[in-house]
């Protein structure tokens, strides 16, 4: 990402699979085929034991993006304010996008990048729940929580001796947002519910069904709707104009449904013309309002916990005084007292990243720059899908954190977009206006631009190596799972990307520092994200990621028994690729084929390190010592200060270098409180960074920093699992983490004391052999699929 939205302003001024593939991974917004199964014996984690973020006051609506608590089911999401008198939900649907296929180039060779051509993610509506008499002056003992253990937002408070409680969540099985108001001690709820449009939609009330609704259609043809209903068997609920009113309700159940006619099928224009969103939303809201509130809650919690409980995190004990602090104060105290570790806070931060993944990526579109959570209809960079770090960083966490079921959203998105990406590549990539066009004149396969939308559209400049970086993410999921069916599904993406590079690479004569020369293959004119220059040959970023792409294609073809001749061609190309050198002048790994110290030394991107992390073909075992030292030198020059996502990437790289102190310090930099719009973590734990007089929310650091934490605890690549490679001193006394994913098809439970591994449980989820390491200890192990092995390194 750029360091400010000025790029968007500038752009405003400057102005292989078969079509029709239906995707199993994305649920369209249609009538549910059967009743949802209601689980029995569900046990919520008690508040006193739950991992939670908590606050002594409601969110201020003017700061909802920094203070509102997020809920989501992968498609529907909301930011929740939890004001007893005036609660508000900023509601979103992941498929609600303006914009088009955007398949034209401007005179400067860029794709248009505005809200009407490229498009933007936006709000579906606001839902407001106003309760009479529950004003700030009347309320006591207020507390709101984001309950990470159970997957819901709660608010509790007292009014005139009665104790009130509010639960808000987005259910994945029932596909609705639920707000449930309860009380103990003789209290009642009276007030009104409003559905507030964020554009020019009109809200209508329907007395016969006791619903309020809105519907509209964008210029791109996307139809959408939202419906709210409420039920109480202890009071009165009615429609008054375009509002719902409720009177003397001891308990009140509010159900919100909404959706669009988006369909992940390029052949059908990404629209399901047979669906009427308003009808589906109304029917669903009414059906769910007939279900008991406890049953809805139990169904949601059982589903959520089936993912959340895949990993437990214990990094050590915090003090009682730390636990007594609300979450925002706790962030501040940790920052101002760097010598006083708060391991439970850091464990909660990791679990918050997992919560965002569970709630943001479930058989849906993948997580964009802001996930499901917005506060207006003008998100920075349109909350798009950026292909030069952001969407990839969003998915680093999944398999490492026991959330492999959340990953397919990314793969299915790429598959759904592939027909359009291929078509636009064939038609527009070698256009004379594209400064990155192939000088070979050849074109094949597919690639992307730096920005992508949900409708097959591309934005900003072409990004030649964006295809390879997406494939790296897709391949990494395979390395964790060894799922052959998944590999077969993504194979067209791998092959098409490799075909693109087979057509693009050019041959040059390169002179090495010792005076020797060699004919090598290099990337044509390109741009090292987002550093420049725009017309460089053989940028390290592309050379490394294409080398990995070619390896992936060969392994996939061999596994699936396909394309033997093409795989052999790719192997030949891979062997002739130029690979980055360490500069004899600076000692750094070069970003370009140039030994001088050029560029912005503290640039936010680590593009030349993509082969070190998230890639792994540069590593301690196979890379020359000089290369590892060149990586270290480059990281030192890049520094320890940047935006959240950039610090997260740095942290993961330092963990790979086994430098626990610097990896941990960068984590603390990400977690510093964002005060006065500075870079850091906001009250609701969203990552923010400064832009002028405001702070921008960008979600990638919320996944990248937890990934770095897990990299401190476990490093893996196929054939190697290393325990505690970079354990910070703050966590060293004692800890235990269960469910860490390891490449090669394994899961690991890890326990330690005084900085040493006390036990490790290794489970095969598809792998059969690997080497285990802990310090100087080594052990080669073989397991059957499903088998478990416990080791105690000595």
Where do the language-model regions lie?
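Aromatic-residue-lined binding/catalytic grooves and analogous aromatic/hydrophobic interfacial grooves
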Residues: 36-458, 476-478, 495, 543, ...
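Well-ordered alpha-helical segments within folded domains of soluble proteins
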Residues: 389-399, 463-475, 541-551, 605-616, ...
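Inter-helical turn/loop segments and adjacent helix faces that build the functional surface
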Residues: 401, 474-489, 508, 553-565
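Non-catalytic carbohydrate-binding regions of carbohydrate-active enzymes
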Residues: 475-481, 485-486, 497-507, 567-600, ...
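N-terminal export signals
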Residues: 3, 9-31
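Short, glycine/acidic-rich hinge or "gate" loops at secondary-structure transitions
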Residues: 364-372, 489, 506-523, 562-569, ...
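Acidic/histidine-rich catalytic neighborhood
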Residues: 496, 500-556
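Acidic/His metal-coordination segments adjacent to aromatic residues that form catalytic metal sites
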Residues: 371-382, 444-460, 524-539, 682-695
């Amino acid at each position: 990402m750029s360091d400010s939205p000025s790029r968007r302003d500038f752009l405003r001024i400057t102005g292989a699979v078969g079509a029709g593939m239906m995707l199993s991974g994305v649920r369209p917004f249609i009538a549910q085929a059967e009743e949802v199964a209601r689980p029995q014996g569900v046990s919520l984690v008690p508040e006193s034991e739950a991992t939670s973020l908590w606050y002594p006051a409601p969110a201020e609506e003017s700061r909802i993006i920094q203070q509102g608590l997020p809920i989501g089911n992968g498609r529907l999401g909301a930011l929740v304010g939890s004001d007893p008198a005036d609660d508000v939900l900023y509601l979103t649907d992941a498929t609600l996008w303006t914009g088009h296929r955007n398949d034209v180039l401007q005179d400067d060779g860029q794709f248009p990048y505005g809200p009407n051509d490229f498009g933007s993610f936006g709000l579906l509506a606001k839902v407001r729940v106003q309760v009479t008499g529950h004003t700030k002056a009347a309320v006591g003992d207020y507390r709101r929580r984001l309950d990470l253990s159970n997957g819901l937002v709660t608010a509790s408070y007292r009014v005139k001796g009665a104790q009130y409680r509010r639960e808000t969540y987005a259910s994945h099985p029932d596909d609705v947002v639920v707000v449930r108001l309860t009380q103990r001690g003789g209290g009642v709820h009276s007030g009104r519910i409003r559905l507030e449009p964020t554009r020019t939609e009109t809200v209508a009330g329907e007395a016969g069904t006791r619903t309020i609704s809105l519907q509209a259609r964008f210029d791109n043809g996307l139809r959408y709707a939202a419906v709210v209903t409420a039920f109480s068997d202890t009071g009165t609920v009615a429609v008054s104009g375009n509002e719902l009113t409720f009177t003397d309700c001891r308990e009140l159940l509010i159900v919100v449904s909404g959706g669009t006619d988006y369909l992940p099928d390029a052949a059908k224009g990404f629209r399901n013309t047979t669906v009427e969103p308003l009808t589906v939303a109304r029917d669903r809201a009414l059906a769910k309002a007939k279900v008991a509130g406890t049953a809805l809650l139990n169904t949601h919690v059982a589903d959520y916990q089936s993912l959340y409980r895949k990993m437990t995190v214990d990094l050590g004990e915090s003090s009682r005084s730390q636990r007594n602090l609300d979450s925002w104060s706790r962030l501040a105290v940790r920052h101002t007292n760097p010598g006083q570790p708060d391991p439970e806070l850091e464990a909660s931060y990791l679990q918050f990243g997992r919560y965002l993944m569970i709630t943001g990526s479930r058989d849906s579109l993948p997580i964009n720059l802001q996930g499901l959570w917005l506060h207006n209809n003008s998100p920075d960079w349109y909350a798009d899908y950026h292909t030069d770090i952001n969407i990839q960083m969003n998915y680093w966490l999944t398999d490492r954190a026991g959330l492999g079921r959340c990953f397919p959203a990314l793969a299915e998105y790429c598959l759904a977009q592939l027909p359009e990406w291929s078509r636009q590549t064939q038609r527009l990539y070698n256009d004379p206006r594209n400064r990155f066009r192939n000088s070979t004149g050849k074109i094949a396969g597919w690639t992307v631009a730096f920005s992508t939308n949900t409708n097959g559209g591309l934005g900003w400049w072409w990004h030649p190596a964006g295809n390879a970086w997406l494939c790296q993410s897709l391949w990494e999921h395979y390395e964790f799972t060894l799922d052959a069916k998944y590999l077969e599904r993504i194979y067209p993406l791998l092959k098409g990307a490799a075909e693109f590079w087979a057509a693009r690479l050019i041959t040059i004569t390169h002179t090495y520092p010792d005076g020797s020369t060699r004919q090598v293959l290099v990337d044509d004119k390109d741009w090292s994200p987002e550093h420049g220059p725009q017309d460089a040959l053989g940028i390290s970023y592309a050379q490394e990621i294409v080398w990995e792409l070619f390896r992936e294609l060969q392994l996939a073809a061999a596994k699936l028994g396909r394309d033997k001749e093409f795989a052999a061609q790719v192997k030949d190309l891979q062997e002739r690729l130029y690979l980055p050198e360490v500069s004899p002048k600076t000692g750094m790994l070069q970003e370009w084929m140039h030994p001088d110290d050029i560029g912005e030394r503290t640039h936010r991107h680590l593009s030349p390190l993509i082969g070190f992390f998230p890639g792994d073909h540069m590593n301690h075992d196979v890379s020359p010592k000089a290369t590892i030292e060149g990586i270290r030198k480059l990281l030192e020059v890049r520094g320890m200060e940047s935006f959240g996502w950039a610090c997260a990437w740095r942290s993961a790289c330092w963990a790979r270098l086994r430098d626990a102190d610097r990896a941990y310090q960068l984590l603390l930099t990400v977690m510093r409180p964002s005060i006065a719009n500075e870079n850091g973590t906001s009250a609701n734990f969203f990552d923010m960074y400064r832009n002028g007089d405001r702070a921008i929310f960008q979600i990638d650091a919320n996944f990248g920093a937890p990934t770095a934490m897990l990299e401190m605890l476990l490093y893996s690549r196929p054939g190697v699992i290393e325990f505690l490679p970079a354990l910070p001193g703050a966590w060293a006394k004692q800890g235990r983490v269960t469910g860490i994913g390891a490449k090669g098809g394994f899961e690991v439970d890890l326990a330690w004391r005084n900085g040493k591994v006390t036990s490790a449980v290794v489970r095969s989820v598809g792998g059969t052999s690997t080497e285990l390491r802990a310090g100087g200890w080594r052990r080669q192990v073989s397991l059957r699929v499903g088998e478990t092995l416990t080791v105690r390194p000595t």
